[in-house]
Amino acid sequence: MKKTSRRLKTLKSKVDPKLYSLNEAVTILRATSNAKFKETAEAHISLGLNPKYADQQLRATVILPKGTGKLVKVAVIAKGEKLTEAMNAGADISGSEELIDEISKGRLDFDKLIATPDIMPLIAKLGRVLGPRGLMPSPKAGTVTLDITKSINEFKGGKVEYRVDRTGIIHVPFGKSSFPEEDLVMNLQTIKDSIDKNKPSGSKGKYWKTFFLSSTMGPSIQIDITSLL
């Protein structure tokens, strides 16, 4: 059984076992984030969904108005004019068949992979490499597109993808714990609005079940969902 560090025990003692408002939770998150690096602020949201049913699956993207605080490295696979567009738009890595070959051999030094629709049949063979890492291009994620410039700018500017896992939980970053409180609150509110907007048609009963915040190395803080609805 994994031991809880003395540091985490101390931080947990600062969080009462109660439900907090969104603003209170963000204040505590910032106060309990004291690692020697810039910790990511994370939301962990349990929804009343069973993703084994097609009409209860949820996968979407949202642009955080205050960004993620992370430098996102974008790779693009395209041909001809679209490849040139990618290079001009600031893609960190770009290529065609040769980049597909490099990825198949283990090159994964990027955070997002964007591709044009015409090249997707060639990328299909990379499913085993990209799939488990959440890097496989997808229309739903906005990573299969002809608008290469827009997609690159959005991901570098704060666009994040979220989806429910097998247990109906969403794990999504919403900035760095060092962000001003009002910026974190704004990003969280944007995520909440997006989840409501993209509510699956098959959702039954209570949609929002639990909502926790934490920093990378910090304790969990539970939000009072009724204060958001």
UniProtKB/Swiss-Prot annotation:
GO-annotated biological processes: translation
Keyword line: Chloroplast, Plastid, Ribonucleoprotein, Ribosomal protein, RNA-binding, rRNA-binding
Source species, domain of life: Eukaryota
NCBIfam families (UniProt xref): rplA_bact
Any one GO MF annotation of this record: rRNA binding
Record HAMAP family: Ribosomal_uL1_B
Cystine pairings recorded for this chain: none
Subunit structure: Part of the 50S ribosomal subunit.
One cellular component term from this protein's GO annotations in UniProt: chloroplast
Annotated InterPro entries: Ribosom_uL1_bac-type, Ribosomal_uL1, Ribosomal_uL1-like, Ribosomal_uL1/biogenesis, Ribosomal_uL1_3-a/b-sand, Ribosomal_uL1_CS
UniProt protein name: Large ribosomal subunit protein uL1c
Organism: Porphyra purpurea
Function according to Swiss-Prot or TrEMBL: Binds directly to 23S rRNA. Might be involved in E site tRNA release (Potential).
Family membership noted in the UniProt record: Belongs to the universal ribosomal protein uL1 family.
Compartments, as annotated in UniProt: Plastid, Chloroplast
